[in-house]
Amino acid sequence: RSRDETWRVILEKTAVWSDLKGIRAHAELRFKCPKKSALAQGIEASSGDILLFTDADCQPPVAWVSSMVAHFAPGVGFVAGYARPDPVTGFVAKLLAVDNIAVGALGAGSIAMGSPFSCTGRNLGYRREVYDSVGGFSRIGHLIGGDDVYFMRLVAAVGGWQMVFNRALAVLSAPPATKMGDIVQQKIRHAAKGGHYRGGALYLAIGVYSFHFFIAWALLQMIWTGEWEIAVMALWSMRWVVDLMLLWRMAMKTERRLLRYLLAVEVVYIPYVLIFTVLGRLGWFRWKS
């Protein structure tokens, strides 16, 4: 569906690499989300038992395929992995990189606990049998985005398969968006996914929102009255320390220097959670141009 020279490049590559197959997406969308429509078409054209996914702006390491496949032990139907932006330059990009580490930690931890909340399509794999058994994207086709997270949640809800997180390596992705408008739209899209959660994931989302609402209310009260509440500051500081410990363990060694920006991210997270979650639930965002 690209309007540039992508298809010409693909044809050139397929001419010299017989294992590479290019597929042109249909103009008519099968699902509301363009990416789900394209992925479904690609999956149908495939013949393998294991499906691996990354994005066009990503660079998987040489051992990526073997590493992902090695995690598909008997009974494992879904393998999620970590992806990080590279290079990361500029203050905003570094804040977004810290946020990316946090999202990765959420995915790794929740999958290990058996209640998956997050994953990324930049580094993902599942069995063809899993895809077929849940009806592909048909149950989530009406939702914009979520070819990764919504599908993972669907597989978890249906049950019958184990999910694991591959920490062995990371896929490098393109640097984050630099235009503030694009960043805002992306974050609203991401926040919108929480509104479609059910069960324990929904209760967690409500808890996170309530916590940030309390922190925001308490901070505004302290600013208004000029009186600092030790209990509130202690709670917020404790949250920062716990997050630092968690993200330090999740981050690749080359990323850990970015955690010096964690405090700034914690501050930005307050309006992000309170405002963007509502805007996302209302559908006030656009898909990638």
Task: Name each model-derived stretch.
Residues F72, V76-G104, E129-D132, F137-A201:
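Catalytic donor/gating beta->alpha subdomain of glycosyltransferases that bind UDP-sugars
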Residues S47-D49, T120-V134:
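Conserved nucleotide-sugar donor-binding
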Residues E28-S37, I43, I144-G145:
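A short, glycine-/small-residue-rich helix N-cap motif at loop->alpha-helix starts
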Residues R1-I10, A27, C58:
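A conserved acidic beta->alpha catalytic loop
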Residues D4-K13, G22, A63:
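Acidic helix N-cap motif at the loop->helix transition within catalytic regions
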Residues I10, P61-F72, V79-Y82:
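A short, amphipathic alpha-helix embedded in the catalytic core of nucleotide-handling enzymes
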Residues L39, L51:
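Short aromatic/hydrophobic "clamp" motif used to bind/position activated sugar donors
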Residues L202-L204, V208-W284:
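Membrane-embedded multi-pass helical conduit in multi-pass membrane proteins
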